[in-house]
Regions:
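Aromatic/acidic polysaccharide-binding cleft in carbohydrate-active enzymes
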Residues: 89-161, 165-176
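C-terminal beta-strand-rich structural cap/linker in extracellular carbohydrate-active enzymes
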Residues: 218-235
Length: 235
């Protein structure tokens, strides 16, 4: 490929991680592939992974799979290169009959879409391709087309973070509350979200407004916000 087009980006073969939730089963296939890449001097520009969790899985499960993929790269001595999540969604049927198709709609679809991108920052995943943009298709748990909650979340995330500097995401000790810090044209801002359910976050006095994924901003009262999904805290 490079001989024909030296500027082409060569992306490694992707691996689906959903069978590795409990036993790292995907290591069995992808480990030897990484060994082969090493033998050829790592002739790629990026790694690829599909971090679909099982159909009943959540963004937390997806994050665990991403961590397992990163761990395998480290075990194999893989050089640092971009990691692309070239297919992602939630609720996709399988593996096995115990994991039926799940429809994820409304605010949950928006929240999980946004979390997929925010967790990617924490995991060092530089690209995420949510599958797939098309008319409604029952194969996918979250639907992506103009005006759908998932698509709205994509647009909002672009407005919030594109062109800003990502600083760091931190968890509380229980791993139930995430704060992601950015620097934009107006200075520091945060995006906060729970890993499960609804949680209350204490806020810095520098922030006066909390904005949700659907574009509604409200004044912050008593320096606290209670949220079920990603919320932007700003001046």
């Amino acid at each position: 490929v490079k001989q024909v087009d030296p500027n082409a980006a060569v992306v490694a073969t992707s691996v689906g991680t959903r069978l590795g939730a409990k036993n790292n089963k995907f290591y069995k296939w992808y480990g030897p592939f990484l060994d082969s890449l090493a033998n050829y001097g790592w002739p790629i520009d990026a790694y690829a992974v599909h971090t679909y969790p099982h159909s009943l899985g959540t963004p937390v499960d997806r994050g665990i799979l991403g961590e397992k993929f990163n761990r395998l790269l480290k075990q194999k001595g893989a050089p640092i290169k971009p990691v692309w999540d070239t297919e992602n969604n939630f609720g996709l049927k399988g593996p096995g009959p115990q994991n039926p198709d799940v429809d994820i709609e409304g605010a949950k679809a928006a929240n999980w879409t946004a979390i997929a991108y925010l967790d990617a920052l924490r995991l060092g995943i530089s690209r995420v391709y949510m599958y797939t943009w098309e008319p409604p298709n029952d194969l996918w748990g979250i639907q992506y087309y103009d005006g759908s909650p998932g698509a709205t979340a994509m647009q909002t995330m672009q407005e919030w973070i594109v062109g800003t500097r990502y600083r760091k995401c931190t968890n509380n000790k229980k791993g139930t509350k995430v704060r992601c810090n950015f620097t934009g044209s107006e200075g520091l801002f945060q995006i906060v979200y729970p890993t499960k359910g609804r949680k209350t976050f204490k806020t810095s006095k520098r922030y006066s407004q909390a904005c949700d994924l659907f574009g509604t901003c409200s004044p912050i009262k008593n320096r606290k916000v209670r949220v079920a999904g990603p919320v932007l805290l700003k001046r």
